């Protein structure tokens, strides 16, 4: 290389060292990135690869979670919502996590409550005693109910206001939380709930209600009800715990549906034999 050219290069290098703006502009003209920029691009790319790998793992987990789910037409939507739920959990976006989780519960519940068989069963059985007999010599059966008890299925599952009108209406007209409680009773407990099952029923339905109350906590413009505000104020300070509690509630709910689905036929046959009570 000629000495003049080498001298010019040396001058340019000195200018770059002395003047950061000149250095930056020269790099732009030559399409050269700094080592710091290279590092940032590298980190961003690594994060993208990491997130992609995580998404693949989570999608496989979601597909396994919904493996064997009886309503196959819902599985693709449920898997997508599950993946969104886990994405928001990684980002510690609790409100969005609750919404994505609740959308899975809502999808399943609304589908079941539009099922003519479940609607028929509920209308005929609302007036039946809520619990079956658990005597020593009596087998646990949907037919062996505590008929001396005035505590009906409707009294257990539905909220107290307008309970008679609700029991005569379709399941689709119930409130969101009443629909969930209905599904848990008829599929989760296969309409064969014992007195000793009350606490577990209360625990799962309370958690599912908490998820419902927290689902809109991040939505702008949506005014929280008094019940939603109380639930959020109770839950949010302990959100690290409730991530796990809510995931546990979703797991139990879905497992109950998987197990209870095959019992719908037997429950319907029992409902056909009885005289509906109000």
Per-region residue spans from a language model:
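Residue-level detector of alpha-helical secondary structure
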Residues: 2-17, 23, 27-34, 50, ...
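Intrinsic-disorder-associated interaction segments
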Residues: 2-5, 15, 19, 23, ...
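Alpha-helical structural motif
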Residues: 8, 74-77, 81, 179, ...
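Charged alpha-helical initiation segments
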Residues: 10-95
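Intrinsically disordered or highly flexible coil/loop and linker segments, enriched in small
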Residues: 22, 94, 110, 114, ...
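A structural signal for well-ordered alpha-helices, especially hydrophobic packing surfaces
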Residues: 37, 82-89, 108-112, 212-222, ...
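Amphipathic alpha-helical interface elements
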Residues: 66-185, 270
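Charge-enriched, short contiguous segments at helix-coil
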Residues: 182-278
């Amino acid at each position: 290389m000629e000495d003049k050219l080498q001298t010019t290069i040396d001058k340019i290098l000195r200018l770059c060292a002395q003047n950061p703006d000149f250095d930056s502009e020269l790099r732009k003209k030559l399409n050269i990135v700094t080592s710091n920029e290279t590092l940032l691009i590298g980190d961003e790319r690594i994060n993208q690869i990491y997130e992609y790998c995580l998404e693949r793992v989570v999608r496989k987990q979601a597909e396994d979670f919904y493996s064997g789910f009886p309503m196959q037409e819902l599985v693709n939507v449920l898997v997508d919502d599950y993946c969104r739920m886990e994405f928001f959990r990684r980002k510690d976006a609790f409100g969005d996590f609750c919404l994505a989780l609740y959308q899975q519960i809502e999808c399943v519940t609304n589908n079941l409550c539009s099922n003519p068989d479940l609607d028929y069963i509920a209308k005929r059985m609302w007036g039946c005693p809520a619990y079956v007999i658990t005597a020593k010599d009596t087998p646990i059966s949907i037919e062996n109910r505590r008929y001396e008890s005035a505590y009906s299925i409707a009294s257990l599952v539905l909220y107290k206001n307008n309970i008679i009108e609700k029991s005569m209406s379709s399941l689709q007209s119930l409130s969101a939380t009443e629909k969930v409680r209905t599904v848990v009773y008829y599929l989760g407990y296969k309409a064969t709930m014992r007195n000793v099952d009350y606490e577990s029923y209360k625990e799962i339905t309370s958690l599912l209600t908490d998820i419902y109350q927290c689902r809109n906590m991040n939505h702008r413009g949506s005014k929280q009800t008094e019940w939603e505000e109380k639930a959020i104020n109770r839950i949010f300070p302990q959100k690290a715990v409730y991530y796990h509690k809510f995931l546990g509630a979703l797991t139990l709910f879905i497992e109950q549906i998987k197990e209870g689905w095959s019992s719908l036929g037997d429950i319907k046959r029992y409902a056909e034999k009885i005289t509906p009570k109000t």
